[in-house]
């Protein structure tokens, strides 16, 4: 079955092409740390031959606690992104939370991301669509895979069909997430075979029901990522940090930065194997 291709400059994203890595840090903690993390990702992905897009947030507007670190904000964040692009020649993905942010962000980065909690907000979707940028839609934890087609339709009606879908798990009772591996195929079918990627970092979240920040299960990042890659998907979304225990956001789910290369070697081996198989139709 023909898979839709979404192009991010010279990077082609599709379910049957070699996987694209969307990776970096959860939130911009500082200019220097962003440079360090981006350089490491670029070095490793170039060594392994993996197409790469750098990820970071300039504002974490959905933190659980009013006291939690949110980021440097729009103006300073765009300056850091511009420096990263100039220094490393890297593509960049970041999220927007308000309609007014869509165009200023799209003027700097290559992919704008629709956060899971906001994925059904039509005014935001329409503003993002109008930019003409490539869009990454995070599947909300409370939305079934089949319903993602409706969100894609909103973008298409807004004049933008350059849409990538991203799964980050579903609510399983209170304060826990699980990933339904069958959901990747359902999302492909619901969106006319749009590229589907897997956010393994945020799928590892779990939390103290009375706590002010998310916990995580980073010890299981490899096994969960291996399972997702075995399905056959367009890309992997993974955040890393040189000192996860002291990260300003989602450290418990972050991959230790020094584990990035061995981790990606596993992911590439699985992706290469799975995509070497002929398509097998078992529906008849």
UniProtKB/Swiss-Prot annotation:
Reactions catalysed according to its record: D-arabinose 5-phosphate + phosphoenolpyruvate + H2O = 3-deoxy-alpha-D-manno-2-octulosonate-8-phosphate + phosphate
GO cellular component terms, A-Z: cytoplasm
EC category: transferase
EC numbers, comma separated: 2.5.1.55
InterPro entries reported in the protein's UniProt record: Aldolase_TIM (IPR013785), DAHP1/KDSA (IPR006218), KDO8P_synthase (IPR006269)
Primary location recorded for the protein, binned into one broad class: cytoplasm
GO molecular function: 3-deoxy-8-phosphooctulonate synthase activity
Keywords, comma-separated and alphabetical: Cytoplasm, Lipopolysaccharide biosynthesis, Transferase
One GO process term, biological-process aspect: keto-3-deoxy-D-manno-octulosonic acid biosynthetic process
Compartments (UniProt record): Cytoplasm
UniProt keyword Cytoplasm, yes or no: yes
Pathway recorded for this protein: Carbohydrate biosynthesis; 3-deoxy-D-manno-octulosonate biosynthesis; 3-deoxy-D-manno-octulosonate from D-ribulose 5-phosphate: step 2/3; Bacterial outer membrane biogenesis; lipopolysaccharide biosynthesis
Source taxon at top rank: Bacteria
Similarity-based family: Belongs to the KdsA family.
Name recorded for this polypeptide: 2-dehydro-3-deoxyphosphooctonate aldolase
Lineage: Bacteria, Pseudomonadati, Pseudomonadota, Gammaproteobacteria, Enterobacterales
């Amino acid at each position: 079955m023909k898979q839709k291709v979404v192009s991010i400059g010279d990077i082609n994203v599709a379910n049957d092409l070699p996987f694209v890595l969307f990776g970096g840090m959860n939130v911009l903690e500082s200019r220097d740390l962003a440079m360090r993390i981006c350089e490491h990702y670029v070095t490793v992905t170039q060594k392994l031959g993996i197409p790469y897009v750098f990820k970071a947030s300039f504002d974490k507007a959905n933190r659980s606690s009013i006291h939690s670190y949110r980021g440097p904000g729009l103006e300073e964040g765009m300056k850091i992104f511009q420096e990263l692009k100039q220094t490393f020649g890297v593509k960049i993905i970041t999220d927007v939370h308000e309609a007014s942010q869509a165009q200023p962000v799209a003027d700097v980065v290559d992919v704008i991301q629709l956060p899971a909690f906001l994925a059904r907000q039509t005014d935001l979707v329409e503003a993002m669509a109008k930019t003409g940028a490539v869009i990454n839609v995070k599947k909300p934890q409370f939305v079934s895979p089949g319903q993602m087609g409706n969100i894609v339709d909103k973008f298409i009606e807004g004049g933008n069909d350059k849409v990538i879908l991203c799964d980050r798990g579903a609510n399983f009772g209170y304060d826990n997430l699980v990933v339904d591996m069958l959901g990747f195929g359902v999302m492909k079918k619901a969106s006319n075979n749009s590229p589907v990627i897997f956010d393994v970092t945020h799928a590892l979240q779990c939390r103290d029901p009375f706590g002010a920040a998310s916990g995580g299960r980073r010890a299981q990042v490899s096994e969960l990522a291996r399972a997702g890659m075995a399905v056959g998907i367009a890309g992997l979304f993974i955040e890393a940090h040189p000192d996860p225990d002291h990260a300003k956001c989602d450290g418990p789910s972050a991959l230790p930065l020094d584990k990035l290369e061995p981790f990606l070697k596993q992911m590439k081996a699985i992706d290469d194997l799975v995509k070497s198989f002929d398509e097998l139709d078992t529906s008849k």
